């Protein structure tokens, strides 16, 4: 047993962990990877390479960009600016300070640059170094990521969402027969680089191949082939095989027999063996590929064909006169009847022709002959004219342009991924470092395109996850950085060329503003940098794991079709098929699956267990969609014996293309890790997900993200076992940084003495300051509560404090309530919800919302604005909540219209006489006219002031309130310092005591004598400071004491220095925006109780609005008198098909009844009626092996565990591997309940039983962020639109109700002419009529007159703008 100071016993915190009865059957081999590592790895590891030494940094991220941009040289090569290394300074403010001061959390980037200046000898041209200057240059502040994977930009927390985009590489498609009326498939290829010009190749309806660059005008593909330097002969030789026709005297031509090119058909002429002259098949007989192969095997090498057969074939080389060697026909020309006669006349023996047949079409040859360009120069000029129309084309410019397009690494980058994809698709073996196009690439793209047209190979599936990759934060910011540095490079070159380089230093050349503005713009305005969804911890995690197909370089909503949005077989285990928004973004915004991760190339990987010879091993392998296609993968629930050997004759496996096959166990390569790897985090929190309809599951996972954190949190009785992981990874709860023992705890902070000692042997101290009532991005309340007590022993990563929506380290988005499914007087019509008054009374669904209000005192033209209590024309009563400075007290209750901060603004006044001016100058009197510009509580807001923050500009004197707040903060910092010092001192002096006791004194303070032996009593008589004055005989001990003293002094100094720095920061004043003298922020917390109109939901997509709050005595109740909390409509189930909620209700019913049973057992044990063994037996029956760790503890601890589950037993039913119907029935039986889960219910109003049994049970319900208080509003007096003079609309404008077109029709249908008239005139935009009506109401009359509505005048004006003059003319009758 370990004892703390003051003899408090140390207890392990793990004893407090919640134990759930788990229904899962599959043992988890792999842990869920950290849920936010996708963000952190991408930015900190891959982009910034933060805590890595300069020499060990890899060439990626920031390092690779700086390497690629530098060195920068001027045009004459006299000056050269090189990059040496970069590093980050510590940020000026920490995360919390940035949030409070509306600043960005960023660190200064310092880059070391070397400027070399050369001397060039004008005569010889030789270069000599003239001078080298190296300097560290500040390149702006780069935003840092917080520990939770977010960024603080201008004080708000933002998330950069990962983007799914098409992977770089080459892709082959066809148009699905949509372009041409005949439905013919037109094939095309597209080369997509990471950056640079796109290259498209396509067939047209006439089977000619064209290419386009960047979707400009199309040109013949052979122009491109000629531009890369291929001649006609090379083109034909590369794409076609050649065959020789040999003349056989008087018989025809002998040609090689090629059985591979034969398709089944009837012969038009005899099949004759050229060598023997035998006729093998007669004309009219059928030949098949199999028969052709048979003849070939039997020795048929050459066949005889008629002379005319050559007509229509294409020459595979120039046809020359055998005598004069004159060219008769060019390569590729078609043999005509005339040409055949010439061949006969000249007795040419051998003719070489191209092999063109249905398996190898004449497309390239036809394109060659359609193309007018015959050489490289004309081809290049042609391309130049298309890309630069209007510019004169010369060969140098054309060559330069073409090279820059695809072959210049500065302008074209396929990226490593693109090169890998290109190599695998074109079957090439080019080094991965070559990230530009090569001549081989272009030749082979055309080859594969032609092969596709010939029916070989298949087109690419664009939605396959092997063809889509993820760009995470690091990569997105890397691209912005590159843009910024390229712009900066231009300005560096300009500055080098402009001035005298000899006198310049590196910092004179670099303008960091260009870079900073690009990065700033990305974080503040990019579509992918989003305001973090901070409603609850789950919504934060989901936001960080989101994958968006939208954004720059991605798709747009309007153009995205069904295919892109649809679920694809490769999504399995990578992207969740359930969680996606409803509406126009459906399928374009997805969520990563629970176990998925992103590899270095940006492809999503999913984990699998390796299977060797039919035995499942514990080796976990991550596979991307491309790799997965090569294997046979079994499902996680395949039957396995205790040794891991797959059972059964055949196993159902997934193979490429999303197909399923049955294979023998030894053929299986991998099996899924767990069935849960298919879905996302939010979906994995839904118990019985497998029993819900997919549409409802989608709503369920989306609505969990809208659940508001409640005052009292309560983890679900029926969970899935993932709750703890979500709470831990979300960053909402506080994790212990090291192993240690809790020294102090209160509601604001936890102090832990760590057990991991430092190098000097002294303990370090961890102080955790908890967040209290902070406002989240969505105005919900962030509040942390400690879970530990003094003396608890905590391990690293234990949860020591709960955050919002967490309960004992598990995520708790709602509450467990007793639900009955029955109709109740029509109050639960159309998904309405009926709730008991108890829920409101006991604050079961009460939440706290915090709003922030800000007022700025500025320096105006007429003088400074002032924050003051002295406000003109305001009663003392209205100022009762304000302090002497004019700022509201913390704790004040406020309602709409109350003053929060008093402020006056000078207003211009009448000119003053010189005498008055003189008096004012003498007496310094400020008799300025001022107007009230105070901050009031807006309409619809009421609550308690929980915090006030005051920021004053540097140099502006602070007011009393600001000084008081500052003092409070300094006291808090001093307490942290003193506590840490106290723990260190306690350790140091107890160590000294151990060393000194038993030693002989040589010298020391007055109280001790030389030669005396030190005892504990002697030391007690000395003060702590006097310990250091003692000198003892043992020299070794003296050395050790000296070392301890040095360490102690260093530690003390470090703590004081840190304290002083923080205090200085507090006292120094703030950086405020231009013109602002002082900023005051007031935070108001409002308690929202549940009320009619609030939206609630379960986890299965079952949502509804509260219709009525019923007194407890009128609600239905159970036979034991328990009143039902909520009544739901049973008709909301059958059509919605989310049966999971019924199973959850049944299991919840078992949960509370089992808890009652355990409580009864405990009571009997305490009354000495039963032994502890009976309780143990029951717990084993209920929990199985999970409970062993509890049963090993003492009897008191077992009883304390039983008391913890007295409200309800917690279950875990993992997704797709959870409780079956039989398990639920077994639990109900164990709880001594009817296995149907239904009970007799009594009507609270009549006291009679309902006719039928009713399903009753505990269900987990959430209160959603759609609160009626934020939506309902009414208008009495308010603003009008300037043009139409009609009241504005909407709550934010304090607007009225729109009486629209259809509402007018309704009144017309009733014939309510007068009602209609007043609606369209005095109640809307008849200005004079409005005033007259008001007058008549004031006078007590009830008549009014309608005039012409303003909108009629607007219409007349619009007519006039069309030059139509409309006048109202009254003619006499």
UniProtKB/Swiss-Prot annotation:
SUPFAM superfamilies: beta and beta-prime subunits of DNA dependent RNA-polymerase. This is DNA-directed RNA polymerase subunit beta. The keyword Thylakoid does not apply. It catalyses: RNA(n) + a ribonucleoside 5'-triphosphate = RNA(n+1) + diphosphate. GO terms for molecular function: DNA binding; DNA-directed RNA polymerase activity; ribonucleoside binding. Its EC number is 2.7.7.6. The gene is rpoB. The keyword ATP-binding does not apply. It is an enzyme of class 2 (transferase). CDD domains: RNA_pol_B_RPB2. The lineage of its organism: Bacteria, Pseudomonadati, Pseudomonadota, Alphaproteobacteria, Rickettsiales.
């Amino acid at each position: 047993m370990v004892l703390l100071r003051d003899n408090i016993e140390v207890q392990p915190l793990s004893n407090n962990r919640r134990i759930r009865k788990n229904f899962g059957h599959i043992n988890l081999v792999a842990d869920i990877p950290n849920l936010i590592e996708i963000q952190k790895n991408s930015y900190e590891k891959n982009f910034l390479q933060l805590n890595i030494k300069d020499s060990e940094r890899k060439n990626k991220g920031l390092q690779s960009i700086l390497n690629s941009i530098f060195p920068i040289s001027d045009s004459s090569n006299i000056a050269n600016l090189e990059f040496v290394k970069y590093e980050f300074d510590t940020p000026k403010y920490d995360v919390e300070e940035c949030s409070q001061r509306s600043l960005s959390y960023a660190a200064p980037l310092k880059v070391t640059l070397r400027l070399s200046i050369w001397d060039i000898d004008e005569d010889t041209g030789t270069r000599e170094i003239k001078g080298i200057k190296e300097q560290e240059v500040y390149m702006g502040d780069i935003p840092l990521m917080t520990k939770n994977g977010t960024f603080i930009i201008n004080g708000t927390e933002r998330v950069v969402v990962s983007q799914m985009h098409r992977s770089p590489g080459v892709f082959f498609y066809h148009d699905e027969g949509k372009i041409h009326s005949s439905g013919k498939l037109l094939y095309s290829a597209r080369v997509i680089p990471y950056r640079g010009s796109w290259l498209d190749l396509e067939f047209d309806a006439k089977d000619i191949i064209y290419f386009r660059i960047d979707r400009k005008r199309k040109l013949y593909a052979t122009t491109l082939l000629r531009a890369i330097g291929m001649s006609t002969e090379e083109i034909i030789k590369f794409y076609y095989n050649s065959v020789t026709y040999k003349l056989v005297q008087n018989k025809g031509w002998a040609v090689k027999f090629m059985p591979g090119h034969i398709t089944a058909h009837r012969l038009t002429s005899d099949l004759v063996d050229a060598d023997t002259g035998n006729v093998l098949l007669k004309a009219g007989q059928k030949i098949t590929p199999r028969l052709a192969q048979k003849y070939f095997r039997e020795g048929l090498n050459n066949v005889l064909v008629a002379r005319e057969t050559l007509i229509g074939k294409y020459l595979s080389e120039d046809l020359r006169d055998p005598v004069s060697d004159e060219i008769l026909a060019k390569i590729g020309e078609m043999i005509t009847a005339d040409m055949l006669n010439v061949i006969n006349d000249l007795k040419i023996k051998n003719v070489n022709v191209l092999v063109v047949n249905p398996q190898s079409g004449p497309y390239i040859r036809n394109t060659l002959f359609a193309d007018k360009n015959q050489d490289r120069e004309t081809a290049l000029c042609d391309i130049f004219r298309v890309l630069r129309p209007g510019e004169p084309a010369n060969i140098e410019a054309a060559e330069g342009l073409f090279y820059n397009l695809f072959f210049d690494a500065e302008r074209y980058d396929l990226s490593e991924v693109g090169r890998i994809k290109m190599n695998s698709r074109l079957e090439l073996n080019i080094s991965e470092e070559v990230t530009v196009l090569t001549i081989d690439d272009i030749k082979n793209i055309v080859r594969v395109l032609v092969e596709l047209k010939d029916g070989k190979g298949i087109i690419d599936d664009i939605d396959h996850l092997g063809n889509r990759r993820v760009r995470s934060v690091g990569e997105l910011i890397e691209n912005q950085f590159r843009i910024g540095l390229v712009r900066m490079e231009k300005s560096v070159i300009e500055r080098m060329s402009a001035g005298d380089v000899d006198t310049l230093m590196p910092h004179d050349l670099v303008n960091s503003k260009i870079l900073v503005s690009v990065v700033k713009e990305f974080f503040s305005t990019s579509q992918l940098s989003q305001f973090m969804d901070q409603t609850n911890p789950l919504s934060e995690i989901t936001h960080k794991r989101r994958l968006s197909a939208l954004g720059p370089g991605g798709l747009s909503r309007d153009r995205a079709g069904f295919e892109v949005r649809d679920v694809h077989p490769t999504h399995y285990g990578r992207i969740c098929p359930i969680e996606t928004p409803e509406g126009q973004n459906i399928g374009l915004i997805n969520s990563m699956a629970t176990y998925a991760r992103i590899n270095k190339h940006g492809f999503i990987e999913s984990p699998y267990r390796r299977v060797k010879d039919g035995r499942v091993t514990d080796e976990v392998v991550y596979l991307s969609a491309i790799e997965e296609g090569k294997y046979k993968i079994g499902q996680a629930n395949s039957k396995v014996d205790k040794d891991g050997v797959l059972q059964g004759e055949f196993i159902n496996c997934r193979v490429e293309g999303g197909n399923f096959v049955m294979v023998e166990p030894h053929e299986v390569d991998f099996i899924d890790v767990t069935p849960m790897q298919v879905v996302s985090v939010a979906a994995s929190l839904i118990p019985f997900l497998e029993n819900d309809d997919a549409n409802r599951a989608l709503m369920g996972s989306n609505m969990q993200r809208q659940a508001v954190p409640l005052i009292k949190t309560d983890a679900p009785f029926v969970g899935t076992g993932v709750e703890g992981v979500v709470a831990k990874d979300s960053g909402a709860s506080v994790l212990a940084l090291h192993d240690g023992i809790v020294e102090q705890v209160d509601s604001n902070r936890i102090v832990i003495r760590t057990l991991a000692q430092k190098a000097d042997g002294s303990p370090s101290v961890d102080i955790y300051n908890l967040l209290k009532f902070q406002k989240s991005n969505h105005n919900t309340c962030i509040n942390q509560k400690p879970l530990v007590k003094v003396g608890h022993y905590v391990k690293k990563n234990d949860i020591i404090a709960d955050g919002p929506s967490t309960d004992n380290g598990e995520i708790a988005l709602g509450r467990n309530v007793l639900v009955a499914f029955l109709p109740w007087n029509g109050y639960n019509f159309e998904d309405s919800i009926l709730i008991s008054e108890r829920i409101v009374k006991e604050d079961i669904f009460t939440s706290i919302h915090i709003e922030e209000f800000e007022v700025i005192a500025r320096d105006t033209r007429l003088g400074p604005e002032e924050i003051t209590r002295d406000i003109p024309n305001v009663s003392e009563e209205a100022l009762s909540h304000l302090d002497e400075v004019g700022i509201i007290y913390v704790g004040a209750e406020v309602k709409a219209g109350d003053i929060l901060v008093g402020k006056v603004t000078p207003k211009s006044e009448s000119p003053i006489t010189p005498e008055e001016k003189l008096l004012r100058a003498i007496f310094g009197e400020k008799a300025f006219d001022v107007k009230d510009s105070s901050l009031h509580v807006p309409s619809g807001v009421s609550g308690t002031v929980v915090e006030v923050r005051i920021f004053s500009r540097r140099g502006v004197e602070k007011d009393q309130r600001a000084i008081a707040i500052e003092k409070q903060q300094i006291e808090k910092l001093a307490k942290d310092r003193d506590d840490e010092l106290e723990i260190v001192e306690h350790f140091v002096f107890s160590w000294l005591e151990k060393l000194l006791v038993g030693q002989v004194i040589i010298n020391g303070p007055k109280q001790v004598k030389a030669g005396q032996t030190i005892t504990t009593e002697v030391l007690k008589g000395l003060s702590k400071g006097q310990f250091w004055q003692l000198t003892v005989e043992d020299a070794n001990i003296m050395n050790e004491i000296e070392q301890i003293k040095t360490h102690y002094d260093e530690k003390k100094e470090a703590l004081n220095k840190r304290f002083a720095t923080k205090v200085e920061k507090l006292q120094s004043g703030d950086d405020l925006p231009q013109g602002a003298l002082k900023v005051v922020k007031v935070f108001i917390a409002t308690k929202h109780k549940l009320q009619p109109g609030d939206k609630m939901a379960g986890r299965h997509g079952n949502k509804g609005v509260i219709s009525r709050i019923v007194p407890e005595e009128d609600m239905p109740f159970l036979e034991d008198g328990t009143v039902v909390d909520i009544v739901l409509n049973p008709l909301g189930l059958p059509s919605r098909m989310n049966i999971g909620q019924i199973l959850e209700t049944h299991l919840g019913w078992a949960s509370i009844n089992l808890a009652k049973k355990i409580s009864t057992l405990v009571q009997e044990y305490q009354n000495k009626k039963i032994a502890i063994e009976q309780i143990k037996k029951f717990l084993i029956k209920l929990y199985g092996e999970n409970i062993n760790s509890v049963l090993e503890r003492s009897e008191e601890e077992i009883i304390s565990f039983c008391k913890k589950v007295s409200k309800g037993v917690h279950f875990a039913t993992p997704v797709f591997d959870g409780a079956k119907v039989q398990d639920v029935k077994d639990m109900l039986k164990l709880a001594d309940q009817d296995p149907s889960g239904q009970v007799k219910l009594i009507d609270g109003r009549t006291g009679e039983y309902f006719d039928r049994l009713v399903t009753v049970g505990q269900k987990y319900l959430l209160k959603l962020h759609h609160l009626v208080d934020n939506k309902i509003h009414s208008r009495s007096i308010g603003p009008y639109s300037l043009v139409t003079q009609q009241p504005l609309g909407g709550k934010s404008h304090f607007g009225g109700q729109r009486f629209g077109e259809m509402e007018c029709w309704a009144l017309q249908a009733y014939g309510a002419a007068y009602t209609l008239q007043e609606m369209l005139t005095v109640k809307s935009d008849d200005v004079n009529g409005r005033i007259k009506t008001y007058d008549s109401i004031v006078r007590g009359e009830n008549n009014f007159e309608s005039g012409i509505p303003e909108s009629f005048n607007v219409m007349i004006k619009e007519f006039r703008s069309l030059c139509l003059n409309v006048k109202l003319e009254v003619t006499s009758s």
